[in-house]
Amino acid sequence: MSSVKPLVYAVIRFLREQSQMDAYTSDEQESLEVAIQCLETVFKISPEDTHLAVSQPLTEMFTNSVCKNDIRPLSNSVPEDVGKADQLKDEGNNHMKEENYAAAVDCYTQAIELDPNNAVYYCNRAAAQSKLSHYTDAIKDCEKAIAIDSKYSKAYGRMGLALTAMNKFEEAVTSYQKALDLDPENDSYKSNLKIAEQKLREVSSPTGTGLSFDMASLINNPAFITMAASLMQNPQVQQLMSGMMTNAIGGPAAGVGGLTDLSSLIQAGQQFAQQIQQQNPELIEQLRNHIRSRSFSSSADEHS
């Protein structure tokens, strides 16, 4: 019985606070006092037993565990409802495969209404919400899934994706780390964690620009060197460079035609890009792959 005394003490404390409120009639206050005395007698607790007090009031504990997560404390689902809910989940998964995300959200929502304490339904709806760019709703669904099952690694992973999309990289890192704690061998979590950590370093750096491409590797790329050398043999580029040098030496007075030089430079750059595309498409693909890698990966995140 001693193990429940802190709980009973919290109940007594709550009842005593209520009895001192003006919202109750004298008879109601008297009834509360009787209830307090009964509990103190049965569990052998007195007001002096302050060592039984917990850090949070009973009302705050209740709010944190139930109201904050918007989860019904008990499920009234019957077996028929559970079966129907699972069927709706499967329908939602099919809609996800067909990229019909709004319909998927609707199916998962119906499943939740039938079986509100199933973490998978909330987590799957979070995935659909993210596909619709409803990232705040996705995070809320992940939080609900975690409230039901604190060991659900996929909920932490999907919350990390939504947080990354909202540029909340520090929180995303925390979510991915928790997901990896629960599922250490998941390559998707590892990859997304690295991306979030890189993004966090970029935004935290005083000189961060958000660009992480290795320019040194590009410059040292033999194909790039060949293309650059070829470009410099272009008579138009040679004429442009000569004109720019003349303007630089001549000072402001020689700056007439600067806009023309800029236009020529842009045109030369376009020719350079076209030449690379024609002669070395692999280098262009390297640049494209880098751009793609900057987007967080979610394709490997399968649905339950």
UniProtKB/Swiss-Prot annotation:
Keywords: Acetylation, Chaperone, Phosphoprotein, Repeat, TPR repeat. The keyword Metal-binding does not apply. One of its GO terms (biological process) is protein homooligomerization. The modification Phosphoserine is found at residues 293, 295, 297. The keyword Phosphoprotein applies. Gene3D superfamilies: Immunoglobulin FC, subunit C, Tetratricopeptide repeat domain. TPR repeats lie at residues 15-49, 85-118, 120-152, 153-186. The modification N6-acetyllysine is found at residue 131. GO terms for molecular function: Hsp70 protein binding; protein heterodimerization activity; protein homodimerization activity. It comes from the Eukaryota. InterPro entries: SGT, SGTA_dimer, TPR-like_helical_dom_sf, TPR_rpt. PROSITE patterns: TPR (PS50005), TPR_REGION (PS50293). It holds the Pfam family TPR_11. Co-chaperone that binds directly to HSC70 and HSP70 and regulates their ATPase activity. Homooligomerize. Belongs to the SGT family. This is Small glutamine-rich tetratricopeptide repeat-containing protein beta. It comes from Mus musculus. The gene is Sgtb.
